[in-house]
């Protein structure tokens, strides 16, 4: 299969040219539009006057002039959507979420669990490991355990009854239940045994510092021990202070990748712009989406607690504590572009950088020979019009 566009994101810049792909990308040829195809205005190839007809020697080239072709997005921090939740351990709910993500330009995702009891986490991990994506759904690339190894003071919306000290053996049991696919663990390094946990657990997966009271020195010790990522920068951690720099400054000094919830509510837009300038290519956009994403206002279960969705904001019921976002990652990309981030940078922060953060950038996250042929066609308003996963059409919305 071949595809032409005048705006294909190759590396960090949009270029014109032709992509060749089947399940994997094979080559990108920059330059002019192939002469054997005509633009019908609908993103289709027209040969011999009839869409889909192919004359002798005609190339199978899809014409996406006027569309942005970007890598499939990679959401490494998303709990739930459309009434379904990864923590429920239900395959039908995983199918629902998978389709929602694909419809919104996400081709790979890390089902993200909450701070639950070990038996519940095991069941969720088993379900995630056995999940097989539908043809019109995004692939799960492994588990993100957001807890239970977090601190009480910065637990946010995590259930305090299930918080557990960092335990490597427990992580190994959960990883076994997940079929060896735990990709990311959020933990608080200042808790009992935290640094020793980081040293051992980082051999299995990416360790992220989050839901933590860690000061600068403790955070740096954790980064030196093997941590390399930060969960939702600015949220559920101590704020930066000119004499108490804390985790945020440590993450910058250590060259860690850092998540940013991109709904414009968790972090004010001017601070988001500052974070982009500070972290650059180490910035990771995430949705941190909840069960009520895509659902009507009301109350919803969440990790053994209840959350309330009102006016586009989800909070722990009866409190002002933000529980997570109610947007897709693609909607987050649109918002940060509106806030002033260049489109190419926003897409990189939602594709190649998260793939690198979970050690999967050899396979997903960018348009490059040998990688999975996951890509999204966006119109000029950044709406998803087509999604390909493993080189096959998964979503089409061109009307």
Predicted regions and their residues:
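C-terminal cap of metal-dependent C-N hydrolases
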Residues: 6, 356, 366-399
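Divalent-metal coordination cores built from histidine and acidic residues
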Residues: 98-181
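Active-site core of metal-dependent hydrolases
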Residues: 176-295
